[in-house]
Amino acid sequence: GHAAANCALARVATALTRRVPASRHGLAEGGTPPWTLLLAVAAVAVLGVVAISLLRRALRIRFRYSKSIQTLRV
């Protein structure tokens, strides 16, 4: 599942980076509709939740390995 999640994150990141210059242009002109901002905020929130969950999994795995290593050292 990690590979699929990373692939999805990469796709979303590329999509966001492609749309960022256009949105910046709109912000400079002052003509961005609020729903695009809402979509951007929602996308960031979803990415944040996914990133946090992946980080928690990685930390759990690391803690398991570190515990096993400590027991092996002792």
Swiss-Prot record:
<feature type="topological domain" description="Intravirion">
    <location>
        <begin position="56"/>
        <end position="73"/>
    </location>
</feature>
<keyword id="KW-0261">Viral envelope protein</keyword>
<protein>
    <recommendedName>
        <fullName>Protein F9 homolog</fullName>
    </recommendedName>
</protein>
<comment type="similarity">
    <text>Belongs to the chordopoxvirinae L1 protein family.</text>
</comment>
<keyword id="KW-0472">Membrane</keyword>
<feature type="transmembrane region" description="Helical">
    <location>
        <begin position="35"/>
        <end position="55"/>
    </location>
</feature>
<keyword id="KW-1133">Transmembrane helix</keyword>
<dbReference type="GO" id="GO:0055036">
    <property type="term" value="C:virion membrane"/>
</dbReference>
<dbReference type="GO" id="GO:0016020">
    <property type="term" value="C:membrane"/>
</dbReference>
<keyword id="KW-0812">Transmembrane</keyword>
<dbReference type="GO" id="GO:0019031">
    <property type="term" value="C:viral envelope"/>
</dbReference>
<keyword id="KW-0946">Virion</keyword>
<feature type="topological domain" description="Virion surface">
    <location>
        <begin position="1"/>
        <end position="34"/>
    </location>
</feature>
